[in-house]
Amino acid sequence: MTTLQKTHEKTRRLVVAGMLSAVSIVLGMTPLGIIPLGPLGVTTMHLPAIIGAILEGPVVGGVIGLIFGLVSLYKAVSGGSLLAPIFMNPLVSILPRILIGPATTYAYRGLEKLTKKHALSIGGGAVAGTLINTAGVMGFIYMLYARQYAEAIGVDPATVGYTILGICATNGIPECIVAVVISVAVCLAVRGIGRRRK
């Protein structure tokens, strides 16, 4: 790879990271980050990190995930939600979001090597990124704040583990579906544009 190509690649990564970080902030700070789906609110706030990780790798995805986490932390500090004190802990609000990038990239690359099918690989990466976000956040809540979380949502602390599993299932499945549909569409479109320019 020539010096010019390396410079072009670094510039592209910076642009992609900047644009998707901006989208992540908008989704995090506005109602656009939640899609009403019947009685559920399906989050789309993790999608920029997933798309960045597929297009540009784990570092870019991790940086965008960090931005997502920082927005979540800011909202916890400035908001009056009953769950705000829980999300003030970076282990809950930030770490799982940073891990979206590596989880997505390595799942995507692994499937790409195995199947050679772009859409399937992107979809698998999107599922991995979504699951690490949901399982990471809810897992840390259970490990660190089970009783406090139970009191905040009004359930018996003895059964809060089952409640969290139920939330992971009822929210995680539609979030995975939405993530796959949007990520496949966006990533294939961006790659198609890139190939035409070459």
Regions inferred by a protein language model and the residue ranges of each:
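Loop-helix junctions at membrane interfaces
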Residues: 1-198
